[in-house]
Every structure is written in C-alpha cells, then in structure tokens.
Amino acid sequence: MQLKELPLNALQFYATSSYPCSYLPGQQARSQVAAPSHLVNGVIYAELVRQGFRRSGLFTYRPYCDGCCACTPVRVLVAEFQPDRSQRRAWSRHSTLQARVLKPSFVQEHYDLYLRYQNTRHAGGGMDHDSVDQYTQFLLQSRVNSRLIEFRETLADGEPGPLKLVSILDVLDDGLSAVYTFYEPESSGSLGTYGVLWQIAEAKKLGLAYVYLGFWIKDSQKMNYKTRFRPLEFLVSGNWRADYPSMPASQLS
C-alpha cells in the first residue's frame, strides 16, 4: 500500500528545516512529519511504519533529506531468523535476566540508567544532558500501543535485582517496532544484541511477522550491527526487498 492510498485524509505531511545529521558527519538532514500528531492512531501508525516512518515521542517522521537517501528502514523476518554464533552466546550469557513488560511511565532508576548510557556511549551527542522532560517526551509519551520492558539481574533468591537494560517498543498489527534501547554501559556481553534477540523472540511468541529496527545507513559504523540479524528486509523505493543495491554479499543472508 502506497502512502497516497492510506486513510490519512485528515493528516498533512510537512518538512522540517535542515539540521546536522546525527549519523553522517558534515551532512544536513531534514524530516517529513505527520501532523496533527493526535490523529496518528495505532492503525495509521502501523501503516506509516511500513512506509518507512518512525516515532519519537508524539512525533511520527521519516527522513526527507535533500539529495540523500542513505537512511534505509529495515525489518527482521521473525519466522526465518536464525541467530549466529555470537548472538547465541549473547542470549546464553544473559539468559538469567528477568524481563518485565510495563506501560511507559517515568521511573527514576530508568532515567539514571539512560543518562549513564548516554554519557558513556554517546557523550557529546546532544542527549547526554537530557532533562527529565526531554527524556519523557522522547521515550514515554505515546498515543499508540507502546511497551517499556525492563531487564534485571536475578538474585540468588530468585528475586529481581539490579537494572541492566530498558527497551521501548511499539506493538503493531504485523510486528514490533523498536523505538529505543539503553543499557548498563559498563556491562559486558552484548546487552544491546540481547535486547534485539528478546524482541525477536517476543514477536514470534505473539505471532508477529517482523521486528522493525528503524533506519540502517550503509556508511554508518554504529548501524552495522543491524545487518547481523538475518534475514533482513530493506525498504527501497517504496518496496520491501531482501537485498540492498550495491551491498556486499557478505553482509546479506
């Protein structure tokens, strides 16, 4: 289904002014935003995700850059997914973590972990000094079917212990959409990988076909991990396909 065919008669789409790209140094970016945001319900949002949109708080957007189409939406095919050796190790290493599915709400412990993660993994990136309001607007505000999953160590008595990982995701009619994940930055053992593996397992349990991983950029080192979750589909020129133009065969299943 193309964007023009969606039941979006009451929506408008506008382009933002340019801003520095977060992924490609020296580049300027723009976004296309769906408005008014309060009309983007769960049904419409799911269709927009299939057309390459993402969500940040109450804003639904997709890249709309001048002369650049590097941001490529990607999704994992849940039923066909097979973890590689390193992913199996990550899953085994963190198999004792206890996951609790919650509605998004502010918890000081989550916010403290978020700041530690930003200051360690993304220092100077602009989010390492987010206020409570900025954190809430970015991750906790939602008008769709969103979930916050917290992962804790298991204590000797079986009770949940220290917080290790938090994921925000949206439940769609055909999959889970990964909004954001942050974790204890000093922990070893690929917690981020474990978080994606948990989402794939959860989608399979729910009978959903996909896990949407957001945007992938071929020339962005920090996004290379996404191509390890195979088979992966790429949204290119409005169509989901199993390969990416000029992508090395070694990076595809």
Swiss-Prot record:
Among the entry's GO cellular component annotations, what is one?
cytoplasm
> Which GO BP terms apply?
ubiquitin-dependent protein catabolic process via the N-end rule pathway
Q: Which GO terms describe its molecular function?
A: arginyl-tRNA--protein transferase activity; leucyl-tRNA--protein transferase activity
- EC primary class: transferase
Q: Which UniProt keywords apply?
A: Acyltransferase, Cytoplasm, Transferase
Q: What is its EC number?
A: 2.3.2.29
Q: Which InterPro entries match?
A: Acyl_CoA_acyltransferase (IPR016181), Asp_Glu_LeuTrfase (IPR017138), N-end_Aminoacyl_Trfase (IPR030700), N-end_Aminoacyl_Trfase_C (IPR007472), N-end_Aminoacyl_Trfase_N (IPR007471)
> What HAMAP family does the database record attribute to this sequence?
Bpt (MF_00689)
Q: What does this protein do, in the record's words?
A: Functions in the N-end rule pathway of protein degradation where it conjugates Leu from its aminoacyl-tRNA to the N-termini of proteins containing an N-terminal aspartate or glutamate.
The name on file for this protein is: Aspartate/glutamate leucyltransferase
Organism, per UniProt?
Answer: Albidiferax ferrireducens (strain ATCC BAA-621 / DSM 15236 / T118) (Rhodoferax ferrireducens)
Q: Which gene encodes it?
A: bpt
